[in-house]
């Protein structure tokens, strides 16, 4: 008997469009001889719809206007437990932060990817740092800025950043993905502008020292005994791998494997698995590192619990390089969700 799988996409986060592209890619690659599919789209207004039309219309956003294939029973499918597994392809807030995971837990339907707690901690860059400090995972130096404190103590906070980190620094909303709202500052003027920009997306901001580093990504898969694929390297077309470089600039390159020694490839895989376990991840995550260009010292950058699944995304590409094609990867993720739920 075929498993019934709900593919959730869209949502109210700033990564709505990326989610649509990822979902379309999953729908094109999933083995329909094994699964009955229930694509469920969530609009930017928070409306839920089942959509049975083409993946192309999901990708380009036309699905919302396609009344023939759209029905308003998206929530009912989940709440009535009409599916066996939920595969959330929703990046960022409300999809990757434990919200959808908690909803699935509440209604008793297995969900692909990490648990509520793991998802919420990994989504919050500041709390990820707090947890991994306990496990002695090397990370870039940082300062946390709260919006309400910045309004009343701006000068003191700016001086703290300058004294502790110097320039250049990266300014990041704590709860945001796909590099949305991230800027790089080389001086005080750019720092102030970057903080204002980041506060459009979150009230808690992470300011990190800008390392002279390469960006290395490791795909991890599994529950109690996770495995890591061969690491890949991002060569951004711009100064850093921002939203435009990730999704709109074809000049950015993905190198598989990363240009590291065999010893360091194994080392970074082992650290990625250590991070995965420390954060109690399950199902999947992409663990991102910064590797110093001079010393090859490895610094944890962030953990993505629902990594991109587009045709150009690193997570499926890394597993394909390891011999696990896209369709088989989806199969394994669904099985991991079901087995964790039955454990």
Swiss-Prot record:
Cofactor stoichiometry and binding remark: Binds 2 magnesium or manganese ions per subunit.
ATP-grasp domain sequence ranges: 129-335
Residues that coordinate or bind Mg(2+) 2: 302, 304
Binding residues for ATP: 162-217
UniProt cross-references to Pfam families, sorted A to Z: Dala_Dala_lig_C, Dala_Dala_lig_N
Chief localisation class: cytoplasm
Annotated metabolic or biological route of this protein: Cell wall biogenesis; peptidoglycan biosynthesis
InterPro entries according to UniProt: ATP-grasp, ATP_grasp_subdomain_1, D-Ala_lig_Van_CS, D_ala_D_ala, Dala_Dala_lig_C, Dala_Dala_lig_N, PreATP-grasp_dom_sf
Keyword Nucleotide-binding: yes
SUPFAM superfamilies: Glutathione synthetase ATP-binding domain-like, PreATP-grasp domain
Gene Ontology molecular function terms on file: ATP binding; D-alanine-D-alanine ligase activity; metal ion binding
Any one biological process term the GO annotation gives: peptidoglycan biosynthetic process
Protein localization: Cytoplasm
Class of the enzyme per the UniProt entry, highest EC level: ligase
Cofactors required: Mg(2+); Mn(2+)
Domain of life: Bacteria
Gene3D superfamilies: 3.40.50.20, ATP-grasp fold, A domain, ATP-grasp fold, B domain
E.C. code: 6.3.2.4
Sites where the protein binds Mg(2+) 1: 288, 302
Substrates-to-products reaction catalysed: 2 D-alanine + ATP = D-alanyl-D-alanine + ADP + phosphate + H(+)
Family: Belongs to the D-alanine--D-alanine ligase family.
Protein name (database record): D-alanine--D-alanine ligase
Gene: ddl
């Amino acid at each position: 008997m075929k498993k019934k799988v709900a593919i959730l996409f869209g949502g109210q986060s700033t990564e709505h469009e990326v989610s649509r592209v990822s979902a379309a890619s999953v729908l094109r690659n999933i083995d329909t001889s094994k699964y009955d599919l229930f694509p469920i789209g969530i609009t930017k207004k928070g409306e839920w719809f089942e959509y049975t039309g083409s993946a192309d219309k999901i990708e380009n956003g036309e699905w919302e206007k396609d009344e023939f294939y759209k029905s308003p029973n998206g929530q009912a499918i989940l709440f009535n437990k009409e599916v066996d597994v939920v595969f959330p392809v929703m990046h960022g807030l409300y999809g990757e932060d434990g919200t959808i995971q908690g909803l699935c837990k509440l209604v008793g339907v297995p969900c692909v990817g990490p648990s509520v707690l793991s998802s919420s901690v990994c989504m919050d860059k500041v709390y990820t740092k707090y947890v991994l400090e306990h496990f002695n995972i090397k990370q870039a130096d940082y300062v946390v800025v709260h919006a309400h404190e910045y309004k009343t103590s701006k000068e003191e906070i700016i001086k703290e950043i300058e004294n502790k980190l110097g320039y250049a620094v990266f300014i990041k909303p704590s709860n945001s993905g796909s590099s949305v709202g991230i800027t790089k500052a080389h001086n005080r003027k750019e720092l102030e502008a970057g903080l204002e920009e980041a506060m459009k997306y979150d009230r808690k901001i992470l300011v990190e020292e800008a390392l002279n580093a390469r960006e290395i990504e490791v795909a991890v898969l599994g529950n109690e005994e996770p495995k890591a694929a061969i690491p890949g390297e991002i060569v951004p077309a711009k100064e850093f791998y921002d939203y435009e470089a990730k999704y709109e600039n074809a000049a950015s390159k993905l190198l598989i494997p990363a240009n590291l020694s065999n010893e360091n490839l194994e080392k970074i895989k082992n650290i990625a698995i250590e991070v995965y376990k420390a954060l109690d991840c399950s199902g999947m995550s992409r663990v991102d590192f910064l590797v110093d260009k001079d010393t090859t010292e490895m610094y944890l950058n962030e953990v993505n619990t629902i990594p991109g699944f587009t045709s150009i995304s690193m997570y499926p590409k890394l597993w394909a390089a390891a011999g696990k094609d896209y369709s088989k990867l989806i199969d394994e993720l669904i099985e991991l969700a079901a087995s964790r739920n039955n454990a």
